[in-house]
């Protein structure tokens, strides 16, 4: 009897296996049929779709995680297909990847007309439906305008400069007392404190420490496998989002309860706008907190890493800042003004090179609103995704000689911002209607940080550290360093 049951069980298992095999074969044929039918109507860019469903996603992430050559995925396909090629990434079988600088510029400049932002749904779910990556049309223009207004020249040159330098003096004194620090983690908290002050009028406290910790989980979830099971990075990201939104709503309720209190922050200004609901405001503030501290904090720790590995650049940077201090009378804790900041020419070179090599925003997603013709007579059909892969051009030897080398001197002939904005092979802040509104703030934060850090400290690396670009650019060990006061 036992033998009969076993035989029956084995037969059932064999049948189930056969059915799965047949079903898999049929799905593969259906995939090829649908793909073939959609492809035959157009002269699509050349490329490969990889495996069904997963496509080339694993190969893409394996490539960008290479510390030796983060362009590996692109390089192999560019040699085979050219700078604009078809792929199958992030669950999207109808996607074209571009590392063509001129085409990338065209895509970004024609937002709203020929293209519109269309990020993967798991990412949009985390960011929120009213985050700047998710919204379109009039609402996008209004929210983008609110961010631009917050960061207008008058506020940057006075309020932000004052707040950044006050916070730097307090923070660097704490680092001096600690002596041994993980710079990446400390910079995250530093910039989060600044953004929390400007957006929510929150001073450094246990609240801002908890917010910074939550953003760590939130960031990890953005490119995690989108499975919302307890314990996964994606699930932790949603829990972090709930916590962060709750904190923002608490600030909103506090303003409602105490209308007489004076707050010079963005939240107060948004609450006075009749056109913005509390849900829109909460998602928008969450996005700005994330975007405003992510690039700036990473650029600070990456800049110190690059300078540590390039003593010649560090010495030239120190000389520039020491000369500025001397011009200002070598007064202790002397604050810089806007003209001082503008005078730091080599510092600007260091900033641009840090942004180029660091690649803190690797790419942007756009959906075609009409059929798009590309060079070579190829067509990207309406409704397809274009992935503008900025890392692909930033680290391309055709546009930047010795592209993997940190070389700030390469920027000396190109220091005017307007000239840099016209360079399609260098777009660390995107472009067009969605040009990052915090571009000038991020550069100023990094310049003021470098000024205070290199004039106050000498340092040594406690461990050798390397850069990983997966799931986002980071220093694997967090850049542990030992600080000493300069004599």
Curated annotation (Swiss-Prot):
One of its GO terms (cellular component) is membrane. One of its GO terms (biological process) is brassinosteroid homeostasis. Its cofactor is heme. The chain crosses the membrane at residues 14-34. Its EC number is 1.14.-.-. It is found in: Membrane. GO terms for molecular function: heme binding; iron ion binding; monooxygenase activity; oxidoreductase activity, acting on paired donors, with incorporation or reduction of molecular oxygen. It comes from the Eukaryota. InterPro entries: Cyt_P450, Cyt_P450_CS, Cyt_P450_E_grp-I, Cyt_P450_sf. Keywords: Heme, Iron, Membrane, Metal-binding, Monooxygenase, Oxidoreductase, Transmembrane, Transmembrane helix. Heme binds at residue 436. Signal peptide: none annotated. It is an enzyme of class 1 (oxidoreductase). It is a single-pass membrane protein. Belongs to the cytochrome P450 family. PANTHER family: CYTOCHROME P450 26, CYTOCHROME P450 SUPERFAMILY PROTEIN. This is Cytochrome P450 720B2.
